[in-house]
Regions:
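Active-site neighborhood of HAD-like aspartate-dependent phosphohydrolases
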Residues: 12-57
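Short, Lys/Arg-enriched N-terminal segments with co-localized hydrophobic residues
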Residues: 2-13
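Structural motif
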Residues: 16, 59, 122-124
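Substrate-recognition element of Asp-dependent hydrolases with the DxDx(T/V) motif
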Residues: 53-79
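Acidic-and-aromatic substrate-binding clefts and catalytic sites of carbohydrate-active enzymes
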Residues: 39-42, 69-73, 101-104
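Short catalytic/ligand-binding loop motif for oxyanion handling, primarily in non-cytosolic enzymes
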Residues: 26-28, 69-73, 132-136, 153
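C-terminal cap/substrate-recognition subdomain and adjoining C-terminal extension
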Residues: 81-179
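Short loop/turn segments at strand-loop or loop-helix junctions that form parts
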Residues: 18-31, 64-67, 127-129, 148
Length: 179
């Protein structure tokens, strides 16, 4: 581990998955329900997410509306506790969340998070929606777009996992090639 000139640990480069929940971790056949009655997370989708994390060593950053209930210290919201337990069953956990002024400015939140965390070497967005500011911030190039949970083949699919892995691991190819 490298040290800063002050003796602290230097931040390691990391990979990040900006994760939406609805339309990514569930589909119309989802029987799992959060305590509020909202659609829960499908095990098959969580297995694919786990595969992405295992093959890339990426961290999960929530961009979903679910994030309003997540706290780094202690979460008491029943829906968030449900999600955290489901993730934990698959060896996954939430690293952080984005903050934006309005739900339609999801790209702004991602951009702000990346600006505040300069140790990110690669990132991908798993989302079933494209927000107006995605193009403005260059997020569309990192977007792996799933289908909304009422559409056919909704949520995270094998091809999405492969695409996300390729995006996250492309930085290793660039580093190996001296770029």
């Amino acid at each position: 581990m490298e040290r800063t000139k002050w003796g602290g640990r230097k931040a390691e480069k990391m990979k990040v998955i900006f994760l939406d929940i609805d339309g990514v971790l569930n589909d119309k056949y989802c029987r799992a329900r959060a305590p509020s009655g909202c659609k829960g997370a499908v095990d098959a989708k969580l297995k694919l997410l786990r595969e992405i994390v295992r093959k890339t060593d990426a961290r999960l950053v929530l961009i979903s509306s679910w994030k309003k209930y997540w706290k780094r210290e202690e979460t008491t919201d029943p829906d968030m506790l449900y999600l955290m337990r489901k993730l934990k069953r698959f060896g996954l956990s939430i690293y952080d969340k984005t903050e934006e002024s309005f739900w339609a400015k999801r790209g702004e939140g991602i951009h702000a998070w990346l600006s505040a965390n300069e140790d990110v070497m690669a990132w991908v967005v798993l989302d079933d929606e494209t927000f107006p500011d995605y193009e403005k911030y260059g997020i569309d190039k990192h977007l792996v777009k799933t289908k909304f949970f009422y559409e056919k083949d909704a949520g995270l699919q094998e091809e999405h996992a492969e695409q996300a892995i390729a995006i996250l691991n492309s930085c290793e190819t660039e580093i190996a090639n001296g770029n």
